[in-house]
């Protein structure tokens, strides 16, 4: 079992219950899922780029990614409906907690010129989204075998009702917010 999951159950739940005066432990916000998305627009010309992106995302998440397809045709981007243009992974349960732990302790501190993550990236319902410019911050990616540096979007979906609750939840895990 992931250390952060134990830490959440043993300490974070009680802290947040006291802070927000919840009547039940079930009212305390929790992390529901973490979604990783990698858009590969260049996959239109070179199909191998998408395969490499899928391999990178599989290495980072430990789970096989789903290839996302274009929802509608956009002439300006030379995209037709149904073209494969990216990949995504939704992590829940044990894998989610393990990834969250790796993200906070290993990956985020390896970001170049890192000064903390913006606390303004909440969506109004307690979910946090962040972008990573380079996939090489994750230790699972071998720097020498990378064909191209790609970014990815990471969305942390919580059961929090407001941004304040969501931020308190992530801050309880020592999430590196900018001061």
Swiss-Prot record:
A Pfam family this chain is assigned to: Ribosomal_L5
- UniProt key word Metal-binding: no
Q: What GO annotations for molecular function exist for this entry? A: rRNA binding; structural constituent of ribosome; tRNA binding
Q: From which residue to which does the signal peptide run?
A: none
Q: What protein does this entry describe?
A: Large ribosomal subunit protein uL5
Record-linked InterPro entries = Ribosomal_uL5 (IPR002132), Ribosomal_uL5_bac-type (IPR020930), Ribosomal_uL5_C (IPR031309), Ribosomal_uL5_CS (IPR020929), Ribosomal_uL5_dom_sf (IPR022803), Ribosomal_uL5_N (IPR031310)
Q: What does the record note on quaternary structure?
A: Part of the 50S ribosomal subunit; part of the 5S rRNA/L5/L18/L25 subcomplex. Contacts the 5S rRNA and the P site tRNA. Forms a bridge to the 30S subunit in the 70S ribosome.
User: What gene name is listed for this protein?
Assistant: rplE
Q: Do you know which PROSITE patterns this protein is assigned to? A: RIBOSOMAL_L5 (PS00358)
Q: What does this protein do?
A: This is one of the proteins that bind and probably mediate the attachment of the 5S RNA into the large ribosomal subunit, where it forms part of the central protuberance. In the 70S ribosome it contacts protein S13 of the 30S subunit (bridge B1b), connecting the 2 subunits; this bridge is implicated in subunit movement. Contacts the P site tRNA; the 5S rRNA and some of its associated proteins might help stabilize positioning of ribosome-bound tRNAs.
Keyword check for Ribosomal protein, yes or no. yes
Look up the record and give one Gene Ontology term from the biological process aspect: translation
Species this protein is from: Pasteurella multocida (strain Pm70)
Which key words are in the record? Ribonucleoprotein, Ribosomal protein, RNA-binding, rRNA-binding, tRNA-binding
- Write down any Gene Ontology CC term: ribonucleoprotein complex
Organism domain of life:
Bacteria
What is the similarity comment for this entry? Belongs to the universal ribosomal protein uL5 family.
């Amino acid at each position: 079992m992931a250390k952060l999951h134990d830490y959440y159950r043993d300490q974070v739940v009680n802290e947040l219950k006291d802070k927000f005066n919840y009547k039940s432990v079930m009212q305390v916000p929790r992390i529901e899922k973490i979604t990783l998305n990698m858009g590969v627009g260049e996959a239109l010309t070179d199909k191998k780029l998408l395969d490499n992106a899928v391999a990178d995302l599989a290495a980072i998440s430990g789970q096989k990614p789903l290839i996302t397809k274009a929802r509608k045709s956009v002439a300006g981007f030379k995209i037709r409906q149904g073209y494969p243009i990216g990949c995504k992974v939704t992590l829940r349960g044990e894998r989610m907690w393990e990834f969250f732990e790796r993200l906070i302790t290993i990956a985020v501190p390896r970001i170049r010129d890192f000064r903390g993550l913006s606390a303004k990236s909440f969506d109004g319902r307690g979910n946090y989204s962040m972008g990573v410019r380079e996939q090489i911050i994750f230790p699972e990616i071998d720097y020498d075998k990378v064909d191209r540096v790609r970014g990815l979007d990471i969305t942390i979906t919580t059961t929090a009702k407001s941004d304040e609750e969501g931020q308190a939840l992530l801050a309880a895990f020592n999430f590196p917010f900018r001061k």
